[in-house]
């Protein structure tokens, strides 16, 4: 018998808008806490095939394991154990950092078809009648002591909190801004309304097995204004993305949209670009099962909530896929919000659902998550520009520092992952590795200063390079 059938359900009611990875994970968390909730999804199905994939790192894996879901995902694909990096001058190097991450944390890095993740989250969710499809949200209304969500079909859903887990094109974010503008003009700044910008586009693809790309390996192939990254999964299935710098920077929502023909044209343009010694972009495209092209928004909001509305995941912070932390960061959002709601649900009905209590909770949610999410966003932003050799400094760092900075990169990765947030009211899994205990609280500077630390590493290398060239010149 489930916990929900033996304990009185909390009077608190949460409306989750978006059947995304973040939204469904939050639903699982709330189900574990016995908090009443529903999920409203605008599409006709929860898990459509869109050609996208997600990487699950230890910080996300631990949350999934707390929810009893991780083994389902782990069984779908082999772990990544080796990373191979290629530069335009033909220089390559390999690193077993992914294997070391697994040894330190007890969880490997895995890449999975996003459709499979959504499918598993839905199939393992205990209250499927709470997940409603074909529910496109039209507006949000504050009503007495609560909030109401109205959908396109005229239905209205009442609750104490609305959570926008509806992605970068968030309707809930738009409604939050509208209501704030009506009731507290100036609260939402022009900076927040222009926070998301686009400088890159990306083709995401899934391809059939290619003999020279062995399962469990991962390739980064860098060039000027371009990078291709691949992950090789179960039975050799290839998850890949081609990321390219666009001619001009645009601001959301006035950003480009791309079609299937745009994806084909871009991959044709770079058909001869080498992913490895034997594989080019044309090979990935010829063997594709699915592919799609999208603009890559980047940005993070300064205000994550207003009144009884709160945002999480891509609706509040959006990053490129280069460091594989977009979904994992959203999972951390869900875990923190659920933990705070669990605490709130234990108060009396009147105290637990009051506007004051909700505002206090949402302030704590943002203050807990903001700096870590901001640091992750900044690292992802730097990673995209490092991988595409965006300027001379990043070109030099990528080519002459990164290949030789393995221990430093590992230690910074460990520190960042070890200080991740999790679901406070659920026990930690038994499989946790030793690295989790090395740092006691979420770190505030591990990621944000990445460029400065890289420059610190770069200068000695440059001096050595210049000294070597000078000696060569003198010897001539």
From Swiss-Prot:
UniProtKB keywords: FAD, Flavoprotein, Membrane, Monooxygenase, Oxidoreductase, Transmembrane, Transmembrane helix
Lineage top rank: taxon: Eukaryota
One Pfam family hit: FAD_binding_3
Recorded GO CC terms: membrane
Main location: membrane
Function: FAD-dependent monooxygenase; part of the gene cluster A that mediates the biosynthesis of the fungal meroterpenoid acetoxydehydroaustin. The first step of the pathway is the synthesis of 3,5-dimethylorsellinic acid by the polyketide synthase ausA. 3,5-dimethylorsellinic acid is then prenylated by the polyprenyl transferase ausN. Further epoxidation by the FAD-dependent monooxygenase ausM and cyclization by the probable terpene cyclase ausL lead to the formation of protoaustinoid A.
Family that this chain belongs to: Belongs to the paxM FAD-dependent monooxygenase family.
Additional note from the record: In A.calidoustus, the austinoid gene cluster lies on a contiguous DNA region, while clusters from E.nidulans and P.brasilianum are split in their respective genomes. Genetic rearrangements provoked variability among the clusters and E.nidulans produces the least number of austionoid derivatives with the end products austinol and dehydroaustinol, while P.brasilianum can produce until acetoxydehydroaustin, and A.calidoustus produces the highest number of identified derivatives.
Official protein name in the record: FAD-dependent monooxygenase ausM
